[in-house]
Amino acid sequence: MLKINNDTKLFGVLGENIPYTLSPAIHNYAFQRLGINAVYLRFDVRRDKFHSIIIGLLNIASGLNVTIPYKEDVVKYLYGVSEEARVIGAVNTIHNLNGYNTDYIAIYNLIKEKLIDKPSICTVFGAGGAGRASIYALLKLGCEVYVINRSLERAQSLEKDFKEFGYDIKIISSCKPGDIIVNATPNSSYVPDECIKGKLVVDLVYNPVKTPLILKAEKTGIRSINGLEILVRQAMEAERIWFGKSLSDEEVVKFLYARKLVR
């Protein structure tokens, strides 16, 4: 049972329309297991209230996570951002008024752990904050990156942003045969069946864990990384930024299943 007192530190996740978020469950469990006197709350904030709320939270919170749709908006309120957050143009973790992108760290490390051979051609579906983090991870792994997005204008804006940092990505309208497919959209069905090929499929959707995309990858014998793996890894990366320590991914996943918070 959490006991709140004058020394209890405040953490939380800031987004809009996020009643589904598992972040409070994950981090409050981690605080308890790590012996940290802190509480983690959900801040579901409308766009017209964002400015006043973020200023208030940055003054009173010891650390924050940021999710849809504010990962890019929050950057201008910070003193500084890490190299990966600067290139990606999106922040999902804040500590001491500095911004980080643990989505990128999680995706990069999980792909590196899953693949033996260096990937060459990779396709990302989605050009939002998660798409940007995925693209940067693939670029740092040595991939030639192709992007498919419903909004051509947004995809071209992303292409321009990465080019400013010396990275070339290509916008395409249909799948290109390659090593890795990443779904960075909220809908795993956005990836056509004919695209599910290669060495690895990554789906950032985490509930259900076994999305249609992950199930199809497993059926065809392709290795996969599901959204829950990414969610938990990025959360533990945030814990390491805040406290210099974290739980194992396996323990957190086991906790979420035991509490029936994922299926």
From Swiss-Prot:
Kindly give the Gene3D superfamilies that the UniProt entry links to this protein.
Leucine Dehydrogenase, chain A, domain 1, NAD(P)-binding Rossmann-like Domain
This protein's UniProt keywords? Amino-acid biosynthesis, Aromatic amino acid biosynthesis, NADP, Oxidoreductase
This protein's record includes keyword Hydrolase: no
Top-rank lineage group of the source organism: Archaea
Q: Which residues bind shikimate?
A: T21, L22, S23, T67, N92, D103, Y206
Q: Which SUPFAM superfamilies has this protein been placed in?
A: Aminoacid dehydrogenase-like, N-terminal domain, NAD(P)-binding Rossmann-fold domains
User: Can you tell me which residues bind NADP(+)?
Assistant: E83, G126, A127, G128, G129, A130, L204, G227
| Reaction catalysed by this enzyme | shikimate + NADP(+) = 3-dehydroshikimate + NADPH + H(+)
Tell me which EC number(s) this protein carries. 1.1.1.25
One MF term in the entry's GO annotations: shikimate 3-dehydrogenase (NADP+) activity
Query: Mind telling me which PANTHER family this protein's record contains?
Result: BIFUNCTIONAL 3-DEHYDROQUINATE DEHYDRATASE_SHIKIMATE DEHYDROGENASE, CHLOROPLASTIC, SHIKIMATE DEHYDROGENASE
> How does the record describe its quaternary structure?
Homodimer.
What protein am I looking at? Shikimate dehydrogenase (NADP(+))
- Organism in which the protein naturally occurs: Sulfolobus acidocaldarius (strain ATCC 33909 / DSM 639 / JCM 8929 / NBRC 15157 / NCIMB 11770)
